[in-house]
Amino acid sequence: MKENCKIDKKQHITDAEWEVMRVVWANSEVTSKFVAKVLCEKMNWKQATIKTLLNRLLEKNILKKREIGNKYIYSTDFTEKEVANNYILGTFDKICKTKVGEMIGKVIENSELSFDDLDLILKAVEKKKKTAVKEVLCDCVAGQCNCEHSGHKHI
């Protein structure tokens, strides 16, 4: 996989496509038959479903394929970390900026984390403190937010 490949932040991967991508990331290169072997029983999917999902991921340029004999080999240039980061940041882009800190806190509270994970989080918090602002301002469109910080007139 190439480092620092850029995925379009607006590129949405469905939950089903995510399952397929996890198989690709775990194995670098896969055939549709291999993906089906891994997922058909777990997800109760048919081979046709797998092929549809692979084609969607190809259309989104998340996957690429090459032909060897009569088989297609699927792979990706994107790491799981890059796609997960894109997904999470995309989710935070959909909520009021004033609520992001609270949501990050909820994620931490509700996640199983190791001491090493917590050390990484604490280091990130210490680094972020150097550039933190006194107050995060709402940047929502008027009528989309009910935070007290928005300054928007509510009807």
Which role fits each region the language model picked out?
Residues 11-16, 68-87:
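Short, cationic-aromatic polyanion-contact patches
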Residues 109-155:
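C-terminal regulatory/oligomerization modules of transcriptional regulators
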Residues 79-105:
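Conserved segment of winged-helix/HTH DNA-binding domains
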Residues 37-45:
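Short helix-coil junctions and helix-kink-helix linkers
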Residues 30-38:
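Short acidic, hydrophobic short linear motifs in intrinsically disordered regions
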Residues 13, 25-31:
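Short capping segments at the starts of secondary-structure elements
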Residues 51-55:
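Short, hydrophobic-biased segments on the C-terminal half of alpha helices
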Residues 61:
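Glycine-centered, phosphate/nucleic-acid-interacting loop/turn motifs that mediate DNA/RNA or nucleotide
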